[in-house]
A protein has these predicted regions:
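Hydrophobic beta-strand positions in blades of beta-propellers and related beta-sheet-rich domains
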Residues: 14, 66-71, 120-124
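Surface loop/turn motifs at the tips and blade-to-blade linkers of beta-strand repeat domains
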Residues: 34-39, 84-90, 112-113
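Blade-level signature of beta-propeller repeat domains, shared across WD40, Kelch, NHL, RCC1
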Residues: 98-133
Length: 133
């Protein structure tokens, strides 16, 4: 969904991506298509100006991890999933909200929540360690 911040309460101004027509469709949510073929929860995204890429992070319950993908355009194509954190190392993890400090530089900062202890942690991933980033 795309909209200006001044239009947040005006749903008729919202635009929805449609991959079949390869364009944004204004005011018709039913025309929206899926951007990422994956189980996505607690999604956040940011444009990293240093690397000129969109970064999307989300919780995937099936893989029990926090996943990251990148794309040169917000509409894709999106990279294969990259695991930022997993439930084997961080039991009962969820959430994956990207911190605004990630807009530039070689680090991705994101918050990760855990049920036990019930808390939120600031995490850091080095983008250079992610291969073809």
């Amino acid at each position: 969904t795309l909209f200006r911040s001044t239009d947040i309460e005006n749903k008729t101004a919202y635009e929805y991506w449609n991959a079949f027509t390869n364009q944004w469709i204004k005011g018709n949510e039913n025309e929206a298509t899926v951007l990422i073929e994956d189980k996505v929860g607690e999604l956040s995204f940011i444009y990293n100006e240093t690397h000129k890429k969109w970064i999307i992070a989300y919780f995937n319950a099936d893989r029990y991890n926090i996943t990251m993908r990148t794309a040169e355009d917000i509409t894709g194509p999106w990279s294969e999933p990259y695991e930022l954190a997993n439930g084997r190392e961080y039991a009962q993890l969820y959430g994956s909200y990207i911190h605004p400090l990630s807009v530039t530089g070689d680090n991705l900062y994101f918050t990760m929540s855990m049920w036990m202890p019930y808390n939120v942690f600031l995490m850091k991933a080095e983008l250079a360690d992610m291969g073809e980033f």
